[in-house]
Amino acid sequence: MGFLENLFNRYTPRTPGEPVFAVIDTETTGFNKRYDRIIEIAAVRADSHFNPVDSWHTLLNPDGKTIKNSHIHGITNDMVTTAPTFSEVYGDFTSYIDGMQLFAHNAPFDSKMIIAETDRMTGVDDDEDEFFPFIDTIDLAKQI
C-alpha cells in the first residue's frame, strides 16, 4: 500500500464534517528564523474527505520588525501595526490545531518559523527540527 493510500485509509473511517486535518500557512518578514518574524498565520481544518470545515487566520505584529518583502505577500507595515503578537494568539492557534494531522507546503520552513516564534515567546531556545508532525505537501506531491 502506497503513502497516499495509507494516509487516506487512516482517516476515511471518520465522520464527514468532523475536522481531522489542518493545512497551515505562514507569511514572514523574511527567511531567517533568528531575525525574521511571522506576520500572518492561518489554518484550514478539513474532514476525512478533505472538505474544508472551518478556518482560522490572523495577521501578526512583528514587534518592530520592518516588512521589506510586501511585494511577495501583499502584507504591509500599516496592516500589522495594531495586529496581535504571536504570543497573544499562540493559545488560540494551538487549540485550533490540537489533535489534527498537520499539512503545510514547504513544512520545514513554516515549522522552523513557528519554533523560532515559540522560542522567543518562552525564552527557551529549543533548536528542535520539528514543531508538530507536519506532512509536507511538497513531499506528498512527489508520491503521486
Please place each PLM-identified region on the residue numbering.
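Conserved non-catalytic scaffold segment of RNase H-like nuclease domains
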Residues: 2-132
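Histidine/lysine/aspartate-rich catalytic loop segments that bind and position anionic ligands
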Residues: 128-144
